[in-house]
Amino acid sequence: MMVIGRTCIATFRETIWKLRLNFDVKEQMMKRPIVAANWKMNVLPSEACHLAEQIRDSTTGLGVEIVLAPPYTHLALLSHLRSSQFSLGAQNVHNANSGAYTSGISVAMLKDLQVEYVIVGHSERREAFPSEKDLISDKICAILEGGLKVIYCCGESRIIRESGKEMDFVASQLAYDFRAVKLWEPENVVIAYEPIWAIGTGLTATPEQAGAMHNAIRLWLKSHYGHENAEATRIIYGGSVKGSNASDLAAIDGIDGALVGGASLNASEFSQIARAFRHHHQ
């Protein structure tokens, strides 16, 4: 009986050690900096592989998760570049699984192309397609239920910022868009704060402004989904992120990465941004 008892204890200890190891690895993966390249409607298919390979090669080994979100037409061409540090993302998705939705792309289609992330709620789509805001909740649910990950975008206009109500506005966006999400999955949701007034304008929120909003978003997550889920969720910044300002943004506690637009069309500058987040999160 004594031998059996010792064996059981040893097995139990080994199991606990493995669980703790897995938990530590999972926790590190969830909080690993993430820098996403949103190519928007740029780069021809004939040019995509060369630029994507440059981005991959210049960011390999940094310990930063890179997500490349090219136009739909490039996804199949770039699927061979995927690795543990380099993922494919889509810039949008339809909320339905299939059906008579001309031009629609479903989660299942993206998953079949080895896509891992989907951007939803980007300010450019919110502005160009006003009805988009009423579909975001359904898209988030479709993405998570389909086994993919969400990069959710939120942010305020200049008018709202100048009125001093930016915190309340972003909180209302979060509440409305995540109203159907009952169980938070921090490893599957990335929140990108992108002030609308900084998108494509050359303007950038100051590190203090960005940091304050990131803290407010995390506090909202804590109040709705709990402390551990909030702390494990990566909150990133988007809004004219460039090589010249990335280091200042990366130095702010609570900013876990960046959603990069125009600067992602230049592999050297994008690499500079990724390196900034590597240095400040080691």
In which residue ranges do the predicted regions lie?
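Methionine residue identity
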Residues: 1-2
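Active-site loop-to-helix "anion-binding N-cap" substructures in soluble metabolic enzymes
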Residues: 23-282
